[in-house]
Amino acid sequence: MALVISFIPDPAKAIAEMARVVRPGGVVATYMWDTLAGGNPLAPIEAALKFLGNPSPSRLSDAASQRDTMQALWQAAGLQSVETYVIRIPVTYSSFDEFCASNIVPIGTVGQVTSKMSADEVEQLKRRLREQLPIGPDGSITYEAFANAVKGRVPG
């Protein structure tokens, strides 16, 4: 169940169902960008939108992306040997233009907000992003994104 737990209305129910259908001794696992702690690759845009007074993109169950919540959900589903860990990745763009072309698009949770913005508002967003992004001397941008992962075994 990769990168979806925050979009599920009832994560506990979904995990319980996965635990039910996986054979005894099988593994139930997921990973999700840590959306509440800024681990999402789109976190810079989300922060800029918030700074500019735009609504933060939200998912149905953002708290489910947290390691402690994942641990609790897996244990509540009766899974054993539950482990959580963090997956860290560098996010790199060759230029600010590449960053914008890849991320200010009318899809996903950020796109739900940016697609409703006027051209002036998009320019304000870009100005804010230029201020906050770590732009290197060569114009490239690199920052870290991180996801939390969890796994547990079905008893038996």
Segments from the language model and where they lie:
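A short SAM/SAH-binding and catalytic strip from SAM-dependent methyltransferases
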Residues: 1-12, 34
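A short glycine-rich, Lys/Arg-flanked "PGG" loop and its adjoining helix->strand segment in the class I
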Residues: 12-27
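Conserved Class I S-adenosyl-L-methionine
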Residues: 59-156
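Short conserved AdoMet
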Residues: 9, 23, 154
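Short SAM/SAH-binding signature in class I
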Residues: 1-3, 29, 147
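Conserved class I S-adenosyl-L-methionine
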Residues: 27-54
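Short histidine/acidic/glycine/proline-rich micro-motifs that form metal-
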Residues: 5, 34-36, 61, 89-90
